[in-house]
Amino acid sequence: MSSSLSQTSKYQATSVVNGLLSNLLPGVPKIRANNGKTSVNNGSKAQLIDRNLKKRVQLQNRDVHKIKKKCKLVKKKQVKKHKLDKEQLEQLAKHQVLKKHQQEGTLTDHERKYLNKLIKRNSQNLRSWDLEEEVRDELEDIQQSILKDTVSTANTDRSKRRRFKRKQFKEDIKGSDFVKDHRYPGLTPGLAPVGLSDEEDSSEED
């Protein structure tokens, strides 16, 4: 009963307000009796929209943080790679200079010691360096060439020493007054031993 009176009172009050509005402000939309419920619904929708907007902002901030972190890591890797590439290119240039000095025979003692160490750890360096395939192949070719030239130079020196010794031996023989027959000491080649005539040689052969 009270609910019905309340609804009636609301309706009457709404009618009075609508009448006043139509007189004072013609064209203004009339107020509906259930306007309070509509306001409540609109308030709930506003709160829901606000919550969704806040969540969206939080997600965006989180994504921005992830993007910044990822960009920072990428930049750090690029700087590290650039530094490594620079060191490797400097190393390659140094090896090329050493190769040139090796071919020209102008290696210093310091360069020679460095080459010996370089050849020993050649395989380890090639595995640890993060080079492009072309640069790695170039380094390996240079080091193999240096090793080959070093071995070839040592073999050439030994061969020269052997040829010199043979030449010296022949010159010593030619410089002697006469060459003794090793079968008959005291005789020169072509002479028969004492007590052995040509006839005896013939009879022994028969």
Swiss-Prot record:
InterPro entries: Rrt14 (IPR031404)
Any one annotated GO CC term: nucleolus
Modified residues (Phosphoserine): 197, 202-203
Chain residue ranges for the region called Disordered: 178-206
Coiled-coil region: none
Comp. bias intervals (Acidic residues): 197-206
Key word Transcription present: yes
Family: Belongs to the RRT14 family.
Function summary: Involved in ribosome biogenesis, probably through modulation of rDNA transcription.
Protein name: Regulator of rDNA transcription 14
Gene name tied to this protein: RRT14
